[in-house]
Amino acid sequence: DWILDTFLGSGTSIIEAKRLGRNAIGIELQKNVIQIAKDNINKEFNKFNVKYEIIQSDCTELNYIKELKKFGISKVQFVIMHPPYWDIIKFSEDENDLSNCKSLKDFLNSIGKLIDATTPILEKGRYLAFVIGDKYSAGEWIPLGFYCMQEIQKRNYKLKSIIVKNFDETKGKMNQKELWRYRALVGGFYIFKHEYIFLFKKV
């Protein structure tokens, strides 16, 4: 089996692939993040001798068919996507970084473009996991997760499950739980403590 992670980040998906004996390809835009991922991945013993590769690229523009040919394969058996939650946290100055999308429409168009690029190389009947949270801005809840879900459902995917993952702290609120609670009470807004894992089957 081969898995594809289009937003590799710190390398967790490849670490888990090594533990499970699955070959893996990770895509990451930022060079400095790739080095962090490599350091993390190298700490994990490769007892199953899995193959894995990290590619520095804009995941929405990559020629996936060409990249897979390098490994002698034409399909992957699982795809995971954990994109930036639009502009909640700005990860870089790169204009290709999804956290720099100027509007919700631009962000969703980029997600749709990525789904279109990866759908042909996901084996039929296999699964796509999409991890995303919502956004709260100017007194309004923006259901980012469900907007992305709808973009994916426009393609050849059937929604199989929605897993809600609870968490108490995020990067943006690290060690500031009481401060953010106070801000929420005074400002009249909601503190997010969850994100979604949407599980889709390619049909």
Where are these regions (language model features)?
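Class I S-adenosyl-L-methionine-dependent methyltransferase catalytic core
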Residues: 1-203
